Amino acid sequence: MSATEEENVLVFDTTMKKKKKSKDSAAQTEEEKKKLKSKTLAMMSQQEDEQEQEDEKKEKRKKKKAALLASTEGENSEAIEKLENEGAHDEDIEAEFMGEKKKKKKSSKSSTTTTTSTTTTTTEPTETEPTEDGESKEKTITTSDGDTFVQGTIPWAGTDRDYKYSELTYRIYHLLQANNPDLISDQKRTMKPPQVMREGTKKTIWANFAEICGTLNRKVEHVYNYVFAELGTNGSIDGNQRLVIRGRFKTSQIEIVIRHYISEYVACRNCKSPNTVLERNNRLYFLCCNACNSKRSVAVIKKGLEGAGKKAPKEQS
């Protein structure tokens, strides 16, 4: 094997091997251990003596403070501060001498630092009691930020300052409650589910079709044209105002069709209110909302499935 091949082969690192300890080195280590023990014991005794001295100084300071507090507070407040400063100064000198850093004790009369924390702006309305004359004061609202303003008034009127988040949110809810309370309330408008039954093997009857059209405030012809277009079939209305649909359909399928019809032709896309009206203008249908007065055009319903008749025979020339 050549020299170049020996260099490429992995070789153990000799520095990582453990060296054998001689007898002389073992004796030296024992002597060093004894010296370290003696040094540590001396250091421990010094620290105990220093701790006792510090405790004695603290007791003397406490006695001086108690004696000074017994006299007038105004005259002796400066003397107390001097004693505290002297004690802190002595501790700093001792810490520097020993090479140890000690934390300074905060005085009880130090200025309190104000910590800012993010808090949610919640409004707490407080109603005032009526006065002796019988006139009740105006309702004031206080927020967690400390802002106070009278209900029904604009606090930034006549000023050039920026709006506050709490003021704007309060104004939004106040206007909604005054103009459209249905949007704030948790009440939900409910509608009866469709009552679907089968008649024979090829027909499905929707029993409460006329009732659902009344709750949606839409014409019967407009609704069943949409139903036939979505289901891809046709049908008619019998004498009991029931919708007869050709084919076999489940209740879940009818419910999906009703939801699509409500989202497209009943519900307002701005305020989600069902209080809307369909108006026709120049062959186009417009959905007008009575709550927010918005207006949008809706798609024309395509016709449902139509039966294909026989083609007329071509004329022979």
Curated annotation (Swiss-Prot):
Residues 1-146 are annotated as: Disordered. InterPro entries: IF2/IF5, Transl_init_fac_IF2/IF5_dom, Transl_init_fac_IF2/IF5_N, Transl_init_fac_IF2/IF5_Zn-bd. Coiled coil: none annotated. Gene3D superfamilies: 3.30.30.170. One of its GO terms (molecular function) is translation initiation factor activity. It comes from Dictyostelium discoideum (Social amoeba). Eukaryotic translation initiation factor 2 eIF2 is a heterotrimeric complex composed of an alpha, a beta and a gamma subunit. This is Eukaryotic translation initiation factor 2 subunit 2. A zinc finger (C4-type) spans 222-246.
